[in-house]
Amino acid sequence: MITPKVLSGFKDRLPKDAIQKAQLLAKVSVVFQSFGFVPIETPHLEYAEVLLPDASSDIQKEIYRFKDHGDRDVALRFDLTVPLARFVSLHHQILGMPFKRYAIGNVFRGERAQKGRYREFTQCDFDFIGSESLVCDAEIIQVIVASLKALDLEDFCVSINHRKILNGICEYFGVSQVNEALRIVDKLEKIGLNGVEEELKKECDLNSNTIKELLEMVQIKQDDLSHAEFFEKIAYLKDYNENLKKGIQDLERLYQLLGDLQISQNLYKIDFSIARGLGYYTGIVYETTLNEMKSLGSVCSGGRYDHLTKNFSKENLQGVGASIGIDRLIVALNEMQLLDERSTQAKVLIACMHEEYFSYANRLAESLRQSGIFSEVYPEAQKIKKPFSYANHKGHEFVAVIGEEEFKSETLSLKNMHSGMQLNCLSFLKALEIIGENDEDL
């Protein structure tokens, strides 16, 4: 006998959970489409050489990589951005530029499983390809805000930085292994200040004083300062080198654009510690956290990558985008009690008291569906207790009962499962009116 078990870091999704996820994905998809992003799909499995060049050393350790039956070196995708690079390199001539795409799919990372972190999880990516304009960067942040608000979230913050600022800080302190240093800095929230200090000392051969001063600069944050006050505070950094100057100027321009979009200023702040560990980022980067659940980590992150297709094509295509971590958001929304708790998408359950009533019940269910009301027929003619118990368990809002009187008069009796109130022998049109109203109106 095989024990029915699931691998650590993976999970089954019960109907209630799957319904919640489908509802959230539908909402963010509508937001993406409203901004003109179009859907694409790429395979879960890619040649390893496609995925590996842009993966950090930490990510490379987490990639599921193996030889397939044809002895090909293949790997499961760890994000949706690297496959996008391969996709646009292959199809850019027919796509047209700039190209706005969204993709929703599962990705795989063999990281340590913990709350809100899985080894298989769903990403919702949206990207703007083929333009270096900061208008695109601002629009991506606008989509982040619109998406989270569509999920009934209001209390969050998009933390923004620029890779050139981090490169400029490393340059100022004479750090030669820039990518490695930024990979370590990106783990500040995960391993803490002492952990970052130890890794910088070990991996980048930096002395304690340099590390201390570097980390002091990396931890510069806007906090409660206004945008104008913060940019005045950091203006001196522009004189340090061109990287810092360019990074700060880009952030100033971005803030102008976000102001033009009338995005509330309390929803985005500058934080120099935001690095994004993936090596392909070159410009503005951002991570989004829920203010009440910061321990959950980033629920939406991304940034600009100006060398998207360098590994696949001589024609360089820039891009900027973000990814929503829908599985983490489900954890948060459940704790906030903002998700539908039902285990069915059908609003009405139709129960028959006798076998011969099923033809009428099925016609009734189809009429409800044609009217936009999801309905199902309980498949057995039983005492009324059993279908009512089923409806309570699944979460149907109404039970329509077909007994002898209802069958003969082509009516139905309707019970509101929330209020417990029941109306007997209703016409279809009257029942339709009631079902379409708020529950408390019955």
From Swiss-Prot:
Chemical reaction(s) catalysed: tRNA(His) + L-histidine + ATP = L-histidyl-tRNA(His) + AMP + diphosphate + H(+)
Keyword Cell membrane set for record: no
Gene3D superfamilies named among the record's database cross-references: Anticodon-binding domain, Bira Bifunctional Protein, Domain 2
Gene Ontology cellular component terms for the protein in this record: cytoplasm
Cellular location(s): Cytoplasm
InterPro entries membership: aa-tRNA-synth_II, aa-tRNA-synth_II/BPL/LPL, Anticodon-bd, Anticodon-bd_dom_sf, His-tRNA-ligase, HisRS-like_core, HisRS/HisZ, HisRS_anticodon
EC class (word): ligase
The enzyme's E.C. designation: 6.1.1.21
GO molecular function, one term: histidine-tRNA ligase activity
Domain of life where this protein originates: Bacteria
Keyword set includes Nucleotidyltransferase: no
Major subcellular location class: cytoplasm
Membrane spanning stretches: none
Cystine residue pairs: none
Biological processes, Gene Ontology terms: histidyl-tRNA aminoacylation
Record note on quaternary structure: Homodimer.
PANTHER family, alphabetized: HISTIDINE--TRNA LIGASE (PTHR11476:SF7), HISTIDYL-TRNA SYNTHETASE (PTHR11476)
UniProt record similarity statement: Belongs to the class-II aminoacyl-tRNA synthetase family.
Record's protein name: Histidine--tRNA ligase
Native organism: Helicobacter pylori (strain HPAG1)
Gene: hisS
